[in-house]
Curated annotation (Swiss-Prot):
<dbReference type="InterPro" id="IPR020924">
    <property type="entry name" value="Ribosomal_eS6_arc"/>
</dbReference>
<dbReference type="GO" id="GO:0003735">
    <property type="term" value="F:structural constituent of ribosome"/>
</dbReference>
<dbReference type="GO" id="GO:0006412">
    <property type="term" value="P:translation"/>
</dbReference>
<dbReference type="GO" id="GO:1990904">
    <property type="term" value="C:ribonucleoprotein complex"/>
</dbReference>
<dbReference type="InterPro" id="IPR001377">
    <property type="entry name" value="Ribosomal_eS6"/>
</dbReference>
<keyword id="KW-0689">Ribosomal protein</keyword>
<protein>
    <recommendedName>
        <fullName>Small ribosomal subunit protein eS6</fullName>
    </recommendedName>
</protein>
<keyword id="KW-0687">Ribonucleoprotein</keyword>
<comment type="similarity">
    <text>Belongs to the eukaryotic ribosomal protein eS6 family.</text>
</comment>
<dbReference type="Pfam" id="PF01092">
    <property type="entry name" value="Ribosomal_S6e"/>
</dbReference>
<dbReference type="GO" id="GO:0005840">
    <property type="term" value="C:ribosome"/>
</dbReference>
<dbReference type="InterPro" id="IPR018282">
    <property type="entry name" value="Ribosomal_eS6_CS"/>
</dbReference>
Length: 150
């Protein structure tokens, strides 16, 4: 059975959460492509999201470290001539390099899937993914200044 990590990003809070996807839940995601949007209730065993939320797949990585590329169809692995992202960041304009990349379809060879949370249109509450235990940067700086003044 396939197992991979799902990195779920929240665009409103700017935070992300890494989730372990195993067995039956992972099997449901196999065959989806970059850009596909699915109902969050599909992975309700892993993360509890309110009704109406959707998840959009934005990319991923294979077991060999090769990134998924939206321009390559299917669950394949091949060498391609890249001039930019994803998979290559040129240092000079016009630079091209042949790199190993994966296709745009999730398969059992994928170890990490990147995704973004899509909010319902009428959602006006706080962000869903929040990292607890973090102090706000302004509060932390104020505490440091108070300690330094003493």
């Amino acid at each position: 059975m396939p197992t991979f990590k799902l990195v779920l990003s929240d665009p409103r809070s700017g935070k992300s959460k890494q989730l372990e996807v195993k067995d039956e839940v992972a099997q449901r995601l196999i065959g989806l492509r970059i850009g596909d949007v699915f109902d969050a209730q599909l992975i309700k065993e892993i993360i509890d999201l309110p009704q109406g939320f959707r998840i959009k797949i934005t990319g991923g990585t294979g077991y060999d470290g090769a990134p998924m590329h939206p321009g390559i169809e299917g669950p394949v692995k091949k060498y391609a001539l890249l001039s930019g992202r994803p998979g290559f960041r040129p240092e000079k304009k016009g630079l091209r390099v042949r790199r190993l990349i994966r296709g745009n379809t999730i398969s059992d060879q994928i170890v990490q899937v990147n995704a973004v949370l899509v909010y319902p249109e009428n959602w006006d509450k706080e962000p869903v993914i929040q990292v607890s235990g973090e102090a706000k940067p302004t509060e932390a700086k104020a505490e440091e200044k108070a300690e330094a003044a003493q």
